[in-house]
Each structure stands twice: as structure tokens, then as C-alpha cells.
Amino acid sequence: MKPQRSLRFTGLAVLSAIASIAMGFSTLALAGVALDLSPQQPDRIRVQKDPAAVKAVSAQFRFVKDDTLTIGIHPTIPPISTYATDAKTVVGFDADLAQVVADSLGRKLELVPVAWADWPLALESGKVDAVLSNVTVTEERKLKFDFSSYRQDQVGFYVKSDSKIVSLKEPKDVAGLRIVTDSGTNQEKILLAWDKENVAHGLKPVAVQYYDDVAVRNLALQAGRADAVFSVNATQAYQAAQQGKTRLVGTVSGGWPRTAELAIATRKGSGLADALTTSLNDLIASGTYTRVLDRWNLGSEAIARSATNPPGLPKL
């Protein structure tokens, strides 16, 4: 059985190898679709109060602040959530969804930035009413928190816009390709599992590549040193819209072979989850949910219906 090949590159090594294209790549963000990262967010979508959602809030639930929905959020990278050009206002899909959910409950929105590792404590301590920050539903997390699902957890294969590759959606499609992925992630586990299956069936192994810098990774793809990048779909969709130099050729559930969903987290048994689920389903029915997704180029990750405490990924 031929062993899998894998390569790890540091930023300096790759930059020196492909410096000839760096100057051109630095202006790519101006060539594609510019998403709004201003603090003003003039095109942010707003909605009216949803009586059904308001009624679904348990009488026992106490909000952190009167007339306000306080949401914990971890600003990372666009389009999910990031800081605006003023370096202090949180913008992105999660912020927009939090806004329309707050609107539907007839409340003002307050976003509280939290470190990723601290979101459970922020909820348990009562610092926030809910957390909306790309949290995947797992059976282990459901022991402590309630969830209202709002988006598919997807990872995606992206290639150069002029690549001859049309589709990468199943194990045999990646055989023999040079694919960049992220070490220690679900997407790496998926890619390695697919590669193992391919080798067992006599197909060519994947040449797995790892980079310690996203910009360098993108440069490697544009230079033809890799055939595809397999990473978080949302962030790659944003880059594709901004730069116009890559395109999607396949998505896979982040929990493959199971389906994984992202959800708003609330304290277990607090009485807020059903109201959030009602709000989300009414936003889906009205088309507002789709508009919010499309504003951040995330339409491919839509769900048909929100659920309270949907099946989560099993504890490993």
C-alpha cells in the first residue's frame, strides 16, 4: 500500500518560491465583489417584531438587560464575524442574523465579543442571553446547553477560477490531487479518511499540503503548486467573492459522514431556545433568512427549517 504524501510549508519558504506573483495577488480584493465591512452597515437587513416569537419566550426567562437581547459573539474572520474598518464594531453574517432575531423579539441588540474558549462560561454566568458564533451542535454540548439551528456546517473544495476541475464531492474525486487543508480540523479528518479509502481501492493517494498562513496558502493555489483548498466553506466563499480568483467545486458536511448544523446556544432549560427557533423559522418563511445569507455569499449553507436541539455530532 503506497503511503500518503504530505507536505508542510512555512510562510517564508513559500513566499520566496512564489514571490513573482505576490504583487499581482495583493490587488485581487479589488477585482471581485466587495462585501461591506463598514461600521455603519447601511444595507443591514431589519425586520418587525414577531408576536409568535415574543410569545414563545418562557415567563421564567430573565434577559440580561431590559428591552435588549445580549448576544455573545467571537469575531474571527469574514464573512462569519469580524471587526469592521473601525476595529471595534462587529460585522458579518452572525451579527446580521443576531440583529433580525433581536428585531423579531422586539428588542435592541447588544453584541458582546467573547473569546472562543469562553463562550460556555459567558452563557453559564449569565453574562449573555445567548451565543451566536458558529457553534456546532454536539451531543456533549447538548447536556449543558439548548440549541436553535440556523446554518449548515460545511467545508468546501475551492480551485482556481480557470481550473479544469469541475467537481470534488466524493473520495474518488480527490485521488492523485494536491490538496491543501488545515491541520487538526474536521476537514483534515475527512480528507485523510477519503484518501485511506482510495488507497484501499487501488487509487492514487492525495498529496496533502499544510500551510501556516492563509495568504500564503492562497498564493500557492494561484501559482499552481496545489490543485485545491479544502477548508471552511464560509471563509472561502467570502474570499471567492472578494477576489474573483477561486470557485467552489464541492461541499461536504463538517461532520461527515453525519450532517452537522450550527446553532444559537442558550442555557439549558432557560426557556429562550423555543422562541429563537420560532423566530428563525419565521425568518426562513418570510425570505429574510435567505437575504441575510446571500448578503454574505453564504446561500449554499442554508437550512430548510430551524430545530430546537437537533441531532448533534456524537462524542468521540
Residue ranges and their predicted role:
Residues 36-53, 186-203, 248-249, 281-316:
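Ligand-binding clefts/hinges and TM-proximal coupling segments of bilobed small-molecule sensing domains
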Residues 161-179:
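Flexible hinge/capping segments at coil-to-helix
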Residues 152-159, 241-281, 298-316:
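Periplasmic-binding protein-like
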Residues 84, 99-106, 187-210, 240-244:
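Ligand-binding cleft/hinge of the Venus flytrap
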Residues 34-134, 295:
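Extracytoplasmic small-molecule ligand-binding "clamshell" domains
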Residues 100-104, 112-113, 117-130, 144-145, ...:
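Short helices/loops that flank or line small-molecule/ion binding pockets
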